[in-house]
């Protein structure tokens, strides 16, 4: 066991006016299984890069271990997988590699295939196995679940549960719950560490947020009451002082000593009220700093004139010699929230693209309603560039609704002035989701919409879909999201 000590860390990207981290201090035990959470753009990947020494910063980061980053860059993907592993760890023991691959349910034959021929899931598992071969290393695992199907996520999560000594960036709640014992969270104003899994951290956060909101409401009422009391006391004191100075025309004799004593007493009480009021204001100013905004999202909806929107009848898709799915039959009706489930390569994305009009060779019958309007969220975000106003204009969507939803998804004002190409992966996916919510359509078709999207934003999207019940056909491997949202599951077999 050793410690990674972060002391007074301050960092900002070149050209930025705002610090991502400011005087941050905390300690990490190198035996921990540390989940790393925070909203998109808060600096999770930046912090990992600081540990790797990629950026200059002020403050200190001290550690007696070396850091390894996942996913690592593979320069020659055409090489055999075993050679890729050797590039990462030239001294690896073959039997140890086979042991790690066995834990991940990966067969030995993948080692003798070109790395580029492996599926995304196989590549992820091989890279993790290679990194855990190294001793005295603390692993920085950055979003390993992207593009992994449910089965692969469970395997990788179980594998990490047997390991220790890593930071894991993931937005999959079930995945984190199964394999972390501490949570490092980047909040609005600080970074904190708590013991437990993600659900433990979230429960504590909700409890703290609710307490602070109740305390804030109580202090707001106290401040108002004290303000009114201060005005009354000040008024009484002023009236008493006028009496002392003989300004009243009652004709009675004034006892200036008694009146002066009473005025002083009133003044003392007024100062006491002011002091209590100021104390309440200061106490209130310390609250709600890390309460995350999770305002309700809005959606632009229209109804279709028929109950059934789409029907697949024994649809099969084949690319050359490779058949990706066979005899798929199901229908999409108004109000359905259907998830396509199946392993990677089972044809889920191909079926979505087929609905959206992409020319994909298929057999069987596909019936799409006449004049059906569809909004599509693709996995790919590489085409996104330009500013948000131009993007909204080019897409023909309501710019105010589009930007309002992005703001609710934690986009700051400065974000609206940036080029979309500079956004983080999660922020780019939010752009596509906000666009889809702004389109007046009958059917939403979403292909892995939540890749890179932070947990709180996922919860906001869940609340929207449950409240407004738009018709949606989607592919997603976040088991918690699917459990909350799907009204039907269409299982695709290999």
List where the protein language model places each region.
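Coiled-coil termination/hinge junctions
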Residues: 283-310
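Extended, highly charged alpha-helical segments
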Residues: 76-78, 83-100, 178, 185-293, ...
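ABC ATP-binding cassette signature C-motif
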Residues: 1-216, 300-494
């Amino acid at each position: 066991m050793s410690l990674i000590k972060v002391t007074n860390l301050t960092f900002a990207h070149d050209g930025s006016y705002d610090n991502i981290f400011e005087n941050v201090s905390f300690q990490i035990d190198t035996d921990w299984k540390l989940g790393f959470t925070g909203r998109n753009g808060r600096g999770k990947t930046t912090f990992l890069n600081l540990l790797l020494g990629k950026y200059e910063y002020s403050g200190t980061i001290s550690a007696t271990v070396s850091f390894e980053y996942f996913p690592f860059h593979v320069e020659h993907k055409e090489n055999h997988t075993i050679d890729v592993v050797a590039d990462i760890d030239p001294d690896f023991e073959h039997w140890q590699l086979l042991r790690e691959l066995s834990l991940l349910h990966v067969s030995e034959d993948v080692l003798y295939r070109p790395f580029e021929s492996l599926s995304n899931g196989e590549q992820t598992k091989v890279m993790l196995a290679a990194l855990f071969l190294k001793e005295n290393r603390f692993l920085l695992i950055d979003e390993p679940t992207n593009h992994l199907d449910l089965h692969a996520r469970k395997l990788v999560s179980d594998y990490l549960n047997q390991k220790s000594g890593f930071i894991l960036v993931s937005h999959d709640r079930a995945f984190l719950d199964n394999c972390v014992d501490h949570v490092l969270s980047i909040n609005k104003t600080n970074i904190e560490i708590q013991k437990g899994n993600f659900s433990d951290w979230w429960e504590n956060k909700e409890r703290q947020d609710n307490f602070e909101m109740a305390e804030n409401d109580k202090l707001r009422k106290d401040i108002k009451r004290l303000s009114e009391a201060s005005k009354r006391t000040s008024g009484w004191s002023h009236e008493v002082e006028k009496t002392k100075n003989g300004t009243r025309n009652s004709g009675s004799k004034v006892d200036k000593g008694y009146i002066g004593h009473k005025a002083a007493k009133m003044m003392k009480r007024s100062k006491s009220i002011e002091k209590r009021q100021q104390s309440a204001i200061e106490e209130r100013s310390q609250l709600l700093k890390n309460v995350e905004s999770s305002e309700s999202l809005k959606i632009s909806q229209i109804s279709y004139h028929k109950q059934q929107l789409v029907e697949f009848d024994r649809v099969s898709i084949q690319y050359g010699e490779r058949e990706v799915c066979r005899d798929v039959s199901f229908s999409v009706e108004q109000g359905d929230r259907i998830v396509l489930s199946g392993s990677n390569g089972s044809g889920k994305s191909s079926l979505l693209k087929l609905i959206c009009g992409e020319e994909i060779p298929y057999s069987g019958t596909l019936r799409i309603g006449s004049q059906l309007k569809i909004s599509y969220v693709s996995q790919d975000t590489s085409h996104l560039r330009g500013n948000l106003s131009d993007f909204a204009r080019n897409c023909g969507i309501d710019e105010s609704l589009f930007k309002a939803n992005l703001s609710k998804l934690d986009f700051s004002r400065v974000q609206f002035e940036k080029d979309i190409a500079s956004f983080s992966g999660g922020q780019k996916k939010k752009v596509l989701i906000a666009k889809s919510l702004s389109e007046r359509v009958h059917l939403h078709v979403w292909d892995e919409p939540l890749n890179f999207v932070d947990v709180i934003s996922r919860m906001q999207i869940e609340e929207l879909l449950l409240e407004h019940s738009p018709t949606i056909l989607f592919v997603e491997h976040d088991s918690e999201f699917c459990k909350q949202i799907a009204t039907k599951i269409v299982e695709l077999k290999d």
